[in-house]
């Protein structure tokens, strides 16, 4: 009987050990999973520059944070100042890669929509120093906004915060804390999520039992109802294979802003939504009608 019990309990001990190891791995290495800043290869050292994407009126910046990190950033403006829209877009990119990989997006915002764009690199990504975590990225976002506010040549522009995926969570947090100042005139969100805890079962189904061990939160679902003082545009790729489109729909329903615009990109997946027909037309219309009040 004792021998039989030994064989019976062996799988339970093995499973218990695996769960323990998995829990420890998620707890101690979750930042490597949540913030894959080394993907693709060379992402920390090879950063394309605005001059390579027909944006000559650009500045390559190094912004110091209050906690001692240095953030890489690009400030890009329309070449023809007389045609420039009085809009500054503070852009927070999605996960992996670096700001250089998103220059095709900013090129359309700058050369097509005539907006000024500040694209900020998170700590630990690209050429920025440090290691990414929720607390740090919150500081980084505030550093970017404070920089825009400090520029005399941008003072008359209307600030619009634009976030994709993890950048959407960063944007929501920043706007919630700064909307009372009255200088943020719009928020644009693409394929972002309710919270990290609710993302784990979708992105890593086998690890859903490890959710309680997650110490990165990004609770956008709790912050979204607090955003009331500016128009919000939701851009949802309905084929998103990483963030379930239901997350975006729920954030839309939670939003209490007076003006909330919902736009679906039927064939857009997590990374291709930005390339879908209508994407930039939706942004242009949102800026014209709800930020600049021209329509």
What are these regions (language model features)?
Residues 252-272:
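Catalytic histidine neighborhood in serine/cysteine hydrolases
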Residues 105, 220, 244-253:
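Short alpha-helix in the alpha/beta-hydrolase fold that links the catalytic acid
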Residues 242, 268-280:
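Catalytic histidine-centered segment of alpha/beta-hydrolase-like enzymes
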Residues 227-228, 233-236, 240:
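Short beta-strand/loop motif that positions the catalytic acidic residue
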Residues 170-229, 272-277:
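Hydrolase active-site cap/lid region
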Residues 13-62:
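An N-terminal hydrophobic leader/cap segment in hydrolases
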């Amino acid at each position: 009987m004792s021998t039989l019990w030994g064989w019976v309990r062996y799988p339970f001990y093995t499973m218990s050990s695996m769960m323990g190891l998995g829990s420890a791995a998620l707890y101690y290495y979750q930042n490597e999973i949540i913030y894959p800043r080394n993907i693709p290869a060379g992402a920390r050292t090879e950063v394309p520059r605005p001059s390579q994407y027909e944006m000559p009126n650009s500045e390559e910046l190094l912004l110091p944070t209050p906690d001692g990190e240095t953030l890489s950033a690009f400030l890009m403006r329309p070449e023809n100042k007389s045609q420039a829209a009085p809009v500054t877009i503070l852009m927070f990119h999605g996960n992996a890669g670096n700001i250089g990989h998103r220059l095709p997006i900013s090129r359309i915002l700058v050369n097509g929509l005539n907006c000024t764009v500040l694209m900020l690199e998170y700590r630990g990504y690209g050429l920025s120093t440090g290691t990414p975590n929720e607390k740090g990225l919150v500081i980084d976002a505030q550093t970017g906004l404070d920089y825009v506010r400090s520029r005399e040549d941008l003072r008359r522009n209307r600030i619009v915060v634009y976030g994709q995926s993890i950048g959407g969570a960063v944007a929501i947090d920043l706007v919630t804390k700064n909307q009372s100042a009255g200088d943020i005139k719009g928020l644009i969100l693409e394929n972002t999520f309710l919270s990290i805890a609710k993302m784990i079962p979708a992105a890593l189904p086998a690890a859903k039992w490890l959710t309680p061990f997650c110490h990165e939160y990004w609770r956008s679902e709790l912050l979204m109802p607090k955003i009331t003082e500016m128009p919000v545009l939701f851009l949802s790729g309905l084929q998103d294979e990483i963030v379930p489109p239901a997350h975006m729909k729920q954030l839309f329903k939670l939003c209490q802003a007076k003006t909330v615009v919902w736009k679906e990109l039927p064939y857009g997946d997590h990374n291709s939504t930005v390339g879908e027909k209508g994407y930039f037309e939706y942004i242009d219309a949102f800026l014209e009608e709800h930020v600049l009040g021209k329509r």
